[in-house]
Every structure is written in C-alpha cells, then in structure tokens.
C-alpha cells in the first residue's frame, strides 16, 4: 500500500516539473500518515474544487487553463462522480471542509442524481451538468451504462451509511440516496447481460 501511495504521490508531483531526486527526497521525508493525508487531500481537492457548478459532480475533463476546445466544460461523468462522492466523504471526515459544507455539496449532488436522465434505472456515462440530460457516449451508446452506474450506486451506499446516524438534517440525505438506489433495480439490464451485453442499456 505504501509503495502504491508513494508512486501515486510521485506521479502527481512530477506534473510540476521537479527533478526526480527532489521528488524522492520529498516523499522520503513524509511519514506514512503524512503521505496518506497528502494523497487524500489532493484527491479531495480535485473533486471539490473542480466540480461542475450546478450538479456538484466530477467533470469529464478538467482543463487547468479553462480552455475547452470541444465546448464540454459542463459535461460530467457518472463513474468519476462515484469516486468523487466517496473522496468528498473522506474529506469531510478528515476535516478538509466542515460537515455543513460537505452536507450542502452532497445535497446538491444527490438532488441532481435523483432528477437526471436514467435508462431502465441505469445512469448514462455522461450528462450535461447544467441540465441533467444525457450526453451520448457514442453514436449507438446514448443510454445507460452499467459499469458507471455501479460506481454511482456504491457511492450512494457510502452516503447512506455516512449520514444515517447524523443530525436531523443529515438524516434526510440517506432517504434521497435510497430513492436513487431503488430506481437502480434493472430487470431490463439483467436480460441484456444474459445475452452478452456488458455495458450499454438502450435509451
């Protein structure tokens, strides 16, 4: 695990153009706890600061320079957002933001997920974050995506467990997360899987 985290940190830091000797010295001086905190904090910040403003979800692409040649700054990814939701929960737990700030973000995210396009209960690969409408993944892939939906469902389970024992306001969030999850019972998807379709659910 430590080797994995060290490699991940080196990868992040190499983007800054430092020499490899400086990188080794920087990570060698970190304790295991400090290294874990660095990785978790930077992961959290990507999903917190880089979120699409309306939905609060993870962008499909994040251009540091703010230039989006394909005019897709508002496109969000369902699977990446599943990772992001769990990273935000970790960030709340570690005190990177207050519980109140975290709850407000989670309420925005879960509200978006409850209203966004779905197909037989499955979420699409991409949405337009400002509308919740599907952005087709390809010419013949404009419906639900089972793999990406699994990441969202896992995140909704984490939200439910994290807030289930919280304040009265926090306890309202698991109910919404459950409603989203219950819509994810996919008999149509199971039939598709049985005939060899692994990813797409038709629109």
Identify what each model region corresponds to.
Residues 1-25:
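Bacterial Sec-dependent N-terminal signal peptides
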Residues 23-73, 120:
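Low-complexity, Ser/Thr/Pro/Gly-enriched N-terminal "stalk/linker" regions
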Residues 25-35, 45-46, 82-97, 112, ...:
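Well-ordered alpha-helical scaffold segments within catalytic/enzyme domains
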Residues 32-35, 39, 73-80, 144-151:
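Secondary-structure capping and boundary motifs in well-ordered enzyme cores
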Residues 33-35, 121-149, 165-203:
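Extended ligand-binding clefts on enzyme/binding-domain cores
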Residues 40-56, 104-121, 175-195:
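Long, well-ordered core segments of solenoidal/helical folds
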Residues 54-60, 96-102, 166-173:
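Surface-exposed patches in mature extracellular/periplasmic domains of secreted proteins
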Residues 74-82, 86-142:
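Membrane helical hairpin/interfacial module
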